[in-house]
Amino acid sequence: MFDFDATLPLMALQFVLLAIILNAIFYKPLNKALDERADYIRQNETGGQQQLAEAKELAAKYEQQLAQARKESQDIVAQAQAEAKQLATEAVAEAQKEAIAKKEAAAQEIEQQRQEALKTLEQQVDTLSRQILEKLLGPELVK
């Protein structure tokens, strides 16, 4: 099957030479390209992780600012509602004061007119009483 003659060392030498040439021409550049690709992937992964961390940090800041803005807007709305309620209360109180003042003024005017009407009625009663007495008794007796 195998002949152990001078061709065997020559074949072994060719195999070693082929391995050295392939190593220099093919395997070293291939390993170098694979290593560079692995470094590139590692760098991109590290950069991606950093960008993801920055994005998460920015998202957290945004959420915090959004929460603060919501709280401030709720405070402003609550303050505006309180001011509106106070203004409404003051307006109602002022309207009640005006209504009471008008009611009192109307009551005083009614009382004044009542007093005037009573005076007028008293005068008319006196006049009518005198006229009746004059008719009954005569004008000479009534004074």
UniProtKB/Swiss-Prot annotation:
Q: Which UniProt keywords apply?
A: ATP synthesis, CF(0), Hydrogen ion transport, Ion transport, Membrane, Thylakoid, Transmembrane, Transmembrane helix, Transport
- Source species, domain of life: Bacteria
Q: Which InterPro entries match?
A: ATP_synth_b, ATP_synth_B-like_membr_sf, ATP_synth_b/b'su_bac/chlpt, ATP_synthase_B_chain
List where the protein spans the membrane: 6-26
Q: Does the keyword Protease apply?
A: no
Q: Where in the cell is it found?
A: Cellular thylakoid membrane
* Gene Ontology MF terms in the entry: proton-transporting ATP synthase activity, rotational mechanism; proton-transporting ATPase activity, rotational mechanism
Q: Which Gene3D superfamilies match?
A: F1F0 ATP synthase subunit B, membrane domain
Topology relative to the lipid bilayer, per the entry, is: Single-pass membrane protein
On whether NADP is a keyword of this UniProt record, the answer is no
GO cellular component terms given for this protein: plasma membrane-derived thylakoid membrane; proton-transporting ATP synthase complex
Q: Which family does it belong to?
A: Belongs to the ATPase B chain family.
Name the job this protein performs.
Answer: F(1)F(0) ATP synthase produces ATP from ADP in the presence of a proton or sodium gradient. F-type ATPases consist of two structural domains, F(1) containing the extramembraneous catalytic core and F(0) containing the membrane proton channel, linked together by a central stalk and a peripheral stalk. During catalysis, ATP synthesis in the catalytic domain of F(1) is coupled via a rotary mechanism of the central stalk subunits to proton translocation. Component of the F(0) channel, it forms part of the peripheral stalk, linking F(1) to F(0). The b'-subunit is a diverged and duplicated form of b found in plants and photosynthetic bacteria.
**Subunit composition?**
F-type ATPases have 2 components, F(1) - the catalytic core - and F(0) - the membrane proton channel. F(1) has five subunits: alpha(3), beta(3), gamma(1), delta(1), epsilon(1). F(0) has four main subunits: a(1), b(1), b'(1) and c(10-14). The alpha and beta chains form an alternating ring which encloses part of the gamma chain. F(1) is attached to F(0) by a central stalk formed by the gamma and epsilon chains, while a peripheral stalk is formed by the delta, b and b' chains.
Stated name of the protein: ATP synthase subunit b'
Organism per entry:
Crocosphaera subtropica (strain ATCC 51142 / BH68)
